[in-house]
A protein has these predicted regions:
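Local sequence-structure signature of Cys/Sec-based thiol-disulfide redox active-site neighborhoods
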Residues: 1-30
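C-terminal basic regulatory modules in eukaryotic proteins
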Residues: 61-62, 75-81
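Thiol/disulfide oxidoreductase modules built on the thioredoxin-like
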Residues: 48-55
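Polytopic alpha-helical membrane proteins, predominantly small-molecule transporters/carriers
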Residues: 69-72
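Thiol-based oxidoreductase modules, predominantly thioredoxin-like and allied folds used
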Residues: 30-43
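A short, hydrophobic beta-strand/beta-hairpin element that forms part of a small beta-sheet core
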Residues: 57-65
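Short alpha-helical
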Residues: 16-17, 42, 67
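Short secondary-structure transition/capping segments
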Residues: 2-3, 45-48
Length: 81
């Protein structure tokens, strides 16, 4: 099952919660564009501007932020598998 929604995962490669989400995605064949806020200053600014905080992981779903790794995994499981 796929989704017609626009998705982006804002993350840092060293963040254990980001790694948890990305591992779930890898194990389940879920592909979501990644935005590394450490390497991409525009991504970091967007995260704060739209989401109101610099917290990762953050899954943007049609431009709306969803935080917390367990919540992100639950959403991905329900909407992309």
């Amino acid at each position: 099952m796929g989704t017609n929604r626009e998705l982006e995962l804002y993350m840092k490669p060293t963040c254990p919660y980001c790694i948890k989400v990305m591992s779930f995605m890898d194990e389940n064949g879920v592909t979501v564009p990644l935005r590394n806020i450490e390497a991409d200053e525009d991504a970091a600014k967007t995260l704060v501007t739209v989401g109101g905080k610099r917290q990762v992981p953050c899954l943007f779903i049609d431009g709306q932020p969803l935080y917390e790794s367990d919540d992100i995994i639950a959403w991905l499981r329900a909407n992309t598998l």
